[in-house]
Regions:
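C-terminal tail/extension regions appended to the core domain(s) of diverse proteins
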Residues: 6-10, 45-46, 52, 59, ...
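Long, polar/Ser/Thr-enriched low-complexity segments
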Residues: 1-113
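Charged linear interaction tracts used for macromolecular binding and regulation
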Residues: 83-231
Length: 235
């Protein structure tokens, strides 16, 4: 730092001011002329990104709440926000497809509950989602974890709308009949269809499986699961 004896002439009186310290004096650029710190801009950008992701995640979570209320999602909401934020970073806009194959109950995922393979289809031409699963002759398509569990069923769920706007998310669902764990003596198949009217916005297609005891959903969270099968955008 230059001392008083070696202090050079002021580069530009309009832009610089003399600063005195114990070590000496020097010309400093006036504060109003300094460029904003790149780090501050980055932090502000991350803050805005976090707000957008959190708001979108809250709206999606609220739309799914009727099917989430009896689960133990733990920190799945934070996982959802993280995935949405990464989607924003990738191309600068919200993309719910990053939630594809997200199990909404980490400790009791669908793969641990379901015993039969299933298929699903998005028929874009006819605007319908289809789901099918084979029902075994004996036992069940779901894992019976308690003797009090007598039957089980499936629910397909469609959430659609604009997660970036208030009060635009809609939810529709189709529920199967009940299938006894004891079996019916014949091989059966559960087939569900959910029709929709495509509107600009985004969608999530989900599957919930649940075990029943005395006609009600069994008490323990391990008796049910919810999985986001796919997601996308209708332009």
């Amino acid at each position: 730092m230059p001392t008083r004896d070696k202090l050079p002439p002021c580069p530009d009186p309009e832009r610089y001011t003399l600063t005195r310290t114990r070590e000496g004096e020097y010309w400093r650029l006036k504060k109003r002329l300094k460029k904003p710190a790149v780090l501050n801009n980055r932090l502000q950008g991350n803050t805005e990104l976090g707000k957008k992701s959190s708001s979108a995640g809250s709206r999606i979570y609220s739309a799914l709440h009727p099917f989430l209320a009896d689960l133990e999602p733990r920190r799945i909401f934070h996982k959802m926000i993280t995935l949405l934020r990464n989607g924003f970073r990738h191309d600068g806009r919200l993309d719910v497809s990053v939630l594809r194959e997200l199990d909404l109950q980490k400790d009791y995922p669908l793969r641990k509950l379901i015993r039969s393979g299933f298929q699903w289809q998005h028929d874009k031409e006819n605007h319908v989602f289809r789901f099918r699963i084979q029902i075994p002759e004996r036992n069940g398509a779901l894992l019976r974890q308690d003797r009090q569990m007598s039957s089980y069923r499936f629910i397909i769920i469609l959430v659609h709308g604009n997660p970036e706007q208030e009060a635009t998310m809609q939810t529709s669902s189709v529920k199967s009949g009940e299938y006894p764990f004891a079996g019916t003596g014949t091989i059966d198949e559960c087939q569900l269809e959910l029709s929709y009217t495509p509107e600009p916005g985004q969608w999530l297609f989900c599957l919930r499986a649940e075990c029943l005891a005395a006609g009600k959903v069994a008490a323990h969270p391990r008796s049910r699961a919810l999985l986001i099968l796919d997601g996308g955008r209708w332009d």
